[in-house]
Every structure is written in structure tokens, then in C-alpha cells.
From Swiss-Prot:
Protein name: Xanthine phosphoribosyltransferase
Pathway: Purine metabolism; XMP biosynthesis via salvage pathway; XMP from xanthine: step 1/1
Similarity-based family: Belongs to the purine/pyrimidine phosphoribosyltransferase family. Xpt subfamily.
Biological-process GO terms, alphabetical: purine ribonucleoside salvage; xanthine metabolic process; XMP salvage
Function: Converts the preformed base xanthine, a product of nucleic acid breakdown, to xanthosine 5'-monophosphate (XMP), so it can be reused for RNA or DNA synthesis.
Cellular location(s): Cytoplasm
Keywords: Cytoplasm, Glycosyltransferase, Purine salvage, Transferase
Species per Swiss-Prot/TrEMBL record: Bacillus cereus (strain ATCC 10987 / NRS 248)
Gene: xpt
Coiled coil: none
């Protein structure tokens, strides 16, 4: 997605060979116009999948998930990382290790909002080692719902998360795929485009 790649190049900051900071538009301050375009792109890519619900994880996945849900006309349910006094019982639970925060979180979804009749699109802001996506897949599978695919805003293709998910037969659609963050520079994966004759 060209507009997203341009935003990453203009406003993202490479902090190391593994870490890209995009808090200027995605995971701290949010650019609503960009989020709207991201939502439209996810809806376009998954429109034939009969999505009934979008599942994401708090908090950075919420903005792109809501915009995609708006385009698809479905609801969003987000996995919580913290226990809530209002959500104590009747929860699906999974453990997720955060590479960025270097900690394991217990994530949960209420059983009241997802069931075996749902066809789910999972959306998240980043895909690196795949732990968040695998945790969300576990929650969806515990509910007996089917997974239509995973939409990722930014994939670090040099890490193994995307490979792990695709090897499980899951459709993964990433809007920006980063090949490298070496030497403080963002390099995107170049996809071959077929020539139309």
C-alpha cells in the first residue's frame, strides 16, 4: 500500500535492526485519514470472505480494525491484555509474549461476543514473531469460530511470524512488508508484478 509505505518512510523512525517506531501515525498518535484508507484496503482484500466479526488486540490494533469493520459492516471485538472487574467469568484466554515489551501477557475475549457461527478476520498493527496473531488465533479457535484470514498493517518480513502463520495455511495480507531495517533504513519487500499484455 503505497500511501502507508510513504508514511513509514516520512514519519517512521528506525530504532534498531528490529524496531520501527511509528507512533506518529499508528500506535500512539493516530492518523484517521490513513486509518480510513487502511480500513478500505483490508475490506477490499477480504470482501469475498463473508466476515462476520473482526478480532484484534488492545490497543494498537483497534484503530485499523474499527475502520475495516466500518467498511465491512461488522463488529470488532478486541482481546484485553489486562483483567477487568467487568469481565471476570466466561472468557477465552491465551498467553502472548510481546517482543517489544519483553513480557508475557494473558489476553482474553468474552465468550458472549464470539461463537462458532462467526467467520473472523484478525487484524493487528504489526507482525514480527507472530505471537500476538497466534494468541488471537487460539482465542478464535477456542470459540469454535473460523478464521478467514489475518490483516496486518506492517509486517517485519525479516522475522519469522509471517512464515509461521502461512505455514499453518492461514491467509495473511500485509499492507506494508519490511525486508530490512538495517543501517537505520527501511527497505520494503519488492513484489513482482505481472505485465499485462
Amino acid at each position: 500500500m503505497k500511501v502507508l509505505q510513504e508514511k513509514i518512510l516520512n514519519e517512521g523512525k528506525v530504532l534498531s535492526g528490529d524496531v520501527l517506531k511509528v507512533d506518529a501515525f499508528l500506535n500512539h498518535q493516530i492518523d484517521p485519514v490513513l486509518m480510513q484508507e487502511i480500513g478500505k484496503e483490508f475490506a477490499k482484500r477480504f470482501k469475498e470472505e463473508n466476515i462476520t466479526k473482526i478480532v484484534t488486540i488492545e490497543s494498537s490494533g483497534i484503530a485499523p480494525a474499527v475502520m475495516a469493520a466500518l467498511e465491512l459492516g461488522v463488529k470488532v471485538i478486541f482481546a484485553r491484555k489486562r483483567k477487568s472487574l467487568t469481565l471476570q467469568d466466561n472468557m477465552y484466554v491465551a498467553n502472548v509474549y510481546s517482543f517489544t515489551k519483553q513480557e508475557t501477557n494473558e489476553i482474553s475475549l468474552s465468550r458472549n461476543h464470539i461463537d462458532e457461527s462467526d467467520r473472523v478476520l484478525i487484524i493487528d498493527d504489526f507482525l514480527a514473531n507472530g505471537q500476538a496473531a497466534l494468541g488471537l488465533m487460539s482465542l478464535v479457535e477456542q470459540a469454535g469460530a473460523s478464521i478467514a484470514g489475518i490483516g496486518i498493517v506492517i509486517e517485519k518480513a525479516f522475522q519469522d511470524g509471517g512464515k509461521k502463520l502461512r505455514e499453518q495455511g492461514v491467509r495473511v495480507e500485509s499492507l506494508a512488508e519490511i525486508a530490512s531495517l538495517d543501517n537505520g533504513t527501511v527497505t520494503f519487500v519488492q513484489h513482482e508484478t505481472a505485465e499485462v499484455k
